């Protein structure tokens, strides 16, 4: 993981120094691939997607502790999944073509899917000393998480079907009946994120 992070940093600095487009493309690909490798190795190091037998833990803990454990596991898995999707979109942006769909999904998958869900994961742990109130994990539900996932799915559908070609750059753009459709489509995605935040605060 540390080796991958070092390669990421070096390739990032090189991309700033050199201006040759071929070299920049190569460095960008190296950066994205090593970034993916570092994220993957880190996820593996914390057993984000398995590799650790937690059956004994689940058997011993109950109530609030079990709810907190399940809340943590679910949010870690889904947040890292969005991080991987974002990095893959960045790699496709470099290799396939600089389409808006890839660029848009990189930003939203990482900023909302990964960072947003990571913040949601730690907020119940950080807020009690600030607000002077204990947050009970048993009272938390999956509505904010589901709203975030639906929001990003809507975003992806809008990017790939309403805005961008389905595969290669030779296919051109898919026409939509009205630009307002696109506005409403992406707007609904944004409002779902707001709804997710509000529902999280209400919980």
Give residue ranges: language-model regions.
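Hydrophobic alpha-helical transmembrane segments of multi-pass integral membrane proteins
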Residues: 1-203
């Amino acid at each position: 993981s540390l080796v991958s992070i070092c390669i990421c940093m070096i390739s990032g600095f090189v991309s700033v120094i050199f201006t040759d487009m071929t070299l920049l493309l190569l460095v960008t690909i190296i950066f994205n691939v090593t970034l993916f490798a570092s994220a993957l190795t880190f996820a593996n190091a914390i057993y984000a997607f398995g590799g650790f037998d937690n059956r004994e833990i689940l058997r011993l803990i109950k109530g609030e502790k079990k709810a907190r454990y399940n809340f943590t596991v679910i949010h870690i898995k889904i947040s890292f999944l969005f991080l991987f999707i974002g990095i893959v979109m960045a790699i496709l942006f470099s290799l396939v073509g600089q389409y808006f769909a890839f660029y848009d999904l990189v930003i939203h998958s990482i900023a909302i899917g990964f960072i947003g869900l990571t913040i949601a994961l730690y907020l119940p742990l950080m807020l009690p000393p600030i607000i002077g109130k204990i947050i009970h994990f048993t009272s938390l539900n999956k509505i904010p998480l589901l709203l975030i996932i639906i929001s990003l799915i809507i975003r992806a559908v809008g990017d790939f079907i309403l805005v961008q070609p389905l595969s290669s750059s030779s296919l051109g753009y898919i026409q939509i009946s009205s630009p307002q459709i696109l506005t409403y489509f992406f707007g609904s995605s944004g409002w779902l994120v707001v709804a997710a935040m509000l529902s999280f605060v209400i919980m």
